[in-house]
Amino acid sequence: MNRLARQAEISPDQLRSSQVTMLYGESGEVEFIDYGVKFWLDVTKVMFSSGNITERHRIGNIDMTGECVVDAFAGIGYYTLPMLVRSKAKHVYACELNPNSIEALKRGAQLNEVTNRLTILEGDNQETLRNLTGIADRVHLGILPSSEQTWALAVSCLKSTGGVVHLHMNVREVE
């Protein structure tokens, strides 16, 4: 065993900062392969969402050949990389605020040899999405508990012919 860490709840701050404590070993750097897609991250700097594995797989199974896609909450590339590697998106515009997540996304893109089909827009997506008006066939809003604050901007990113918006949110079960 080289490393051991304890992951606490994801921080509620805007960057969704890591709450990992290294118990053994020093480096929090991790490289892994998920359904043929290579990811890299430093678990001490960015959060890792193990709970979205089913959705990552589902998104990777959608044929996006020839499509321009916007990922409004890119993180380390949870959905961006499967869209490029498995779904064969022509190009993905990935919006991300956290510099540590951006570094992980860049490393993942290099590992998967898709950097030429990826544009990363660093900053608050309330601003960066405004630069993507009318370019997308598909917009992905993969954030919990809700992506509602970006719905209008997401729709404005779609081409004039329309497209698909994937949105994530928690909903209450009504009895």
Which residue ranges define each predicted feature?
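Short beta-strand element of Class I
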Residues: 90-95, 165
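Non-catalytic substrate-recognition/targeting regions of SAM-dependent transferases
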Residues: 1-51
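Conserved class I S-adenosyl-L-methionine
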Residues: 66-75
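Conserved beta-strand signature within the Rossmann-like core of class I S-adenosyl-L-methionine
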Residues: 161-170
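Conserved alpha-helix/loop element of class I SAM-dependent methyltransferases that forms part
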Residues: 50-66
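A short glycine-rich, Lys/Arg-flanked "PGG" loop and its adjoining helix->strand segment in the class I
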Residues: 151-162
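S-adenosyl-L-methionine
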Residues: 95-138, 146-147
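Conserved SAM-binding loop of SAM-dependent methyltransferases across substrates and taxa
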Residues: 76-89
